From Swiss-Prot:
GO cellular component term, pick one: nucleus
Organism: Schizosaccharomyces pombe (strain 972 / ATCC 24843) (Fission yeast)
UniProt-listed Gene3D superfamilies: Electron Transport, Fmn-binding Protein, Chain A
Gene Ontology molecular-function annotations: FMN binding; pyridoxamine phosphate oxidase activity
Protein name: Uncharacterized protein C725.03
Amino acid sequence: MSLAWKNELLKLLKENVDSSGVIHPEYFQLATLPTGNEIYPRNRTVAIRGFVGTGWHKPRPDDVLATDLLVFSTDIASHKAAEIAEQQKNTFPSGPIPNAFEMCGWLPKTMQQIRISGQIWLYTPELADRNEFPADKLIQDHLINSNGRIPEEWSWEEERRRIWELHSPELRASFSTPPSYSKYQGDVKVSPLPSTLTGKEDPGVIEAWKTAWGRFSLVVCEANEVEFLNLTPPPGKRVLHNRDLNTKQWSSTRVNV
């Protein structure tokens, strides 16, 4: 497996970190295909949490697992989750890929654009139990330095827990609020939620925590094409990274801007 595009992405995001907190290079615009009776593609901004197993750091010897799968969280009560789940259900077992995605990010400090395309997957324990999420195959196809074996101490539930703990108490609480686009019936009081329960919390916090954890899911982005466009200095530089869907091997090509 080639790590060229992953290493380049990690380098660029590090170069674009803003100590003031104004610039968040991990925010990307994500576009997916329409479902059902919808006409238009859907687009939204998401906060990528790094790569499955390692987050935003380069693979280290003590990592349980390392991949080139990008991951972020979403609420299973959201339209986004329902759309992705419907598309991936129609993807199995083979054929067209209705769960296609493209994401795009702009890095203002270095004047660079990143585009990533491929297949998008929603993970919940229920989807995995119904074989509507390719749990093992997805990892086996994207493992880095693990000889094709999934470590026994790693699981998708452990990954969900890891991402959950990365969220702030306030952001965790947002998963217990009324679903997006539901009828507005006044502001809802939100209390920050801990990463785990001790049993000493107020009943209201415990109930909110259970709701939030139950609605907390992962979105996994399986990249097949990655494009880096550097606009400075002119005339710029555009590099394409493509993954062969049969051999799973990556190739890189520089093309004109």
